[in-house]
């Protein structure tokens, strides 16, 4: 009931997000609202050629990929969804485990009549990406995975004990009340503490995403992404029990964040992993070091399988 009552407010809040300017997607892109199993994803689609799916994480939306999409659109069919409950996608009650969200990605591709895809992911997008790749192994040709771990895999149990990731367990009705109306303050913590240079995340970017996360149910559903980590860990171990991924993977770590540990973790689930560490960057690679990050991605995509 509450979600139905808030639907009009969602439309109003979306206009707040539009008021803050970030790098736009080029005119070659159109948007579609694509129905999946229990959700409707806001998807940007542009270009022609082999498919590339770009998946974002917490603290941003598919908008983070606009600079890369502008480069790839000339050679690829570029598909950029907002994950369920995030950005301009719908806010279903459940389905925030990454196994279910991998199904969202599959349904998007099915709707577009696309079978195979390259995959580029960051943060929580990595977790959805692994769940997709592990369940639909014959649909992924290559994966670029950026600066975040996979629940239940590798050094996960040590990572979740770090005070840096206290937010993994920060959720619940009272926690949501603490953040409500203070979304910008909450998000500033991530941009400031997880970056090598907080000034690289400019005011327009911060205002844009703060407005998106101030939309009704947005923080609630973002917290649900973290709440699903325990189930994600169970699912990931089950995926791994069926064998490692064998297609090529580029694991990108920021030198002030995961660094070489990014590739180390991915090697637990894959056999063909190349490592790239981006200098002078924290977790927010596309904002802090976009040129170096995009150059690394473009270089690996240019390689023939």
What do these predicted regions represent?
Residues 281-289, 294:
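Catalytic histidine-centered segment of alpha/beta-hydrolase-like enzymes
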Residues 61-62, 127, 282:
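A short, glycine- and basic residue-enriched loop/turn
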